[in-house]
Amino acid sequence: MDGDIENQVELEEKTRLINQVLELQNTLEDLSARVDAVKEENLKLKSENQVLGQYIENLMSASSVFQTTDSKSKRK
């Protein structure tokens, strides 16, 4: 009789551990998918940032407000 109870306890413990492992595997898969999504978003934002940086540079170079003037050479 004690053997049956011990076997039942072991079986319940194994079942609990298997369920815990499966839950952790699912969590890991979810986290891995999230990391991949964040990496993709990061690459997209880097690309957009480069485009915006180039756009700002072009605007600044086309605007007289941002042109550097050497006032000392004009005075001479």
Curated annotation (Swiss-Prot):
Record-linked InterPro entries: SCOC (IPR019357)
Swiss-Prot/TrEMBL GO biological process terms: positive regulation of macroautophagy; regulation of protein complex stability
Pfam families noted in UniProt: DUF2205 (PF10224)
Coiled-coil residue spans: 6-52
Location, primary (coarse class): Golgi
Membrane topology reported for the UniProt record: Peripheral membrane protein
Keywords: Coiled coil, Cytoplasm, Golgi apparatus, Membrane
A GO cellular-component term linked to this record: cytosol
Localization: Golgi apparatus membrane; Golgi apparatus, trans-Golgi network; Cytoplasm, Cytosol
Function summary: Positive regulator of amino acid starvation-induced autophagy.
Similarity field: Belongs to the SCOC family.
Record-given protein name: Short coiled-coil protein B
Gene source species: Danio rerio
Gene that encodes it: scocb
